Curated annotation (Swiss-Prot):
PANTHER family: RIBOSOMAL PROTEIN L25/GLN-TRNA SYNTHETASE, ANTI-CODON-BINDING DOMAIN-CONTAINING PROTEIN, RIBOSOMAL PROTEIN L25_GLN-TRNA SYNTHETASE, ANTI-CODON-BINDING DOMAIN-CONTAINING PROTEIN. Gene3D superfamilies: Ribosomal protein L25, beta domain, Ribosomal Protein L25, Chain P. It comes from Rhodopirellula baltica (strain DSM 10527 / NCIMB 13988 / SH1). CDD domains: Ribosomal_L25_TL5_CTC. GO terms for molecular function: 5S rRNA binding; structural constituent of ribosome. One of its GO terms (biological process) is translation. This is Large ribosomal subunit protein bL25. Residues 190-212 are annotated as: Disordered.
Amino acid sequence: MPRSVPVMTDVIQVTKRESTGTAATRRLRRDGHVPAVLYGHGEANEHLAVPSAQVKGLLRHHSKTVQLSGDVDETALVSDMQWDPLGIEVLHMDLIRVNLKEKVELGVPIVLHGEAVGVREGGMLLENVHEVEIRCSAGSIPDNLVLEVSELGVGEHKTAGDLTLPEGVELITDVDVVIAHIEAQRDEEIAEAGDALAEPEVISKGSGEADE
């Protein structure tokens, strides 16, 4: 079974922003940068610009913690990303100052692993919850948490307490929260599926009259 592994800390180059108005922010985005704000630890907020290409790298790597370089030398936690209405481009980032040893609380995604017995028996695997809240050191945040479902039968479920937790990771979400379950298909759903397989596809249909 795959193991949950900590995410490597990405290094991103940042520059300080002198102007923070709407017009300045639009120019920043046109120039290929994402505006960001760094805060926390009782220090003053820093308004930053991050290259869009590096933000895309964070998304590919599922990075939670980043090492800031350039105008600011800090370790930060990516606490929030604001997206455009289509969910394509990141419009803004919130970063929280952390040190890699301090404890942080955040949500991490769940990955279901294995082909459930109940699915092979004709049931449906339904995922009730897609992420859970955990507490761990900022330098040991896992990419995801794995839930083994291969032995799950029809009518059975797995809870947050069944998740595989890496060393040093504490579950905040209630252990009794149902993450996934196997539901039996209703008779009418099975009948409809059978009818769909039995009926040939009509490629074209004539009017019933012979061509003249």
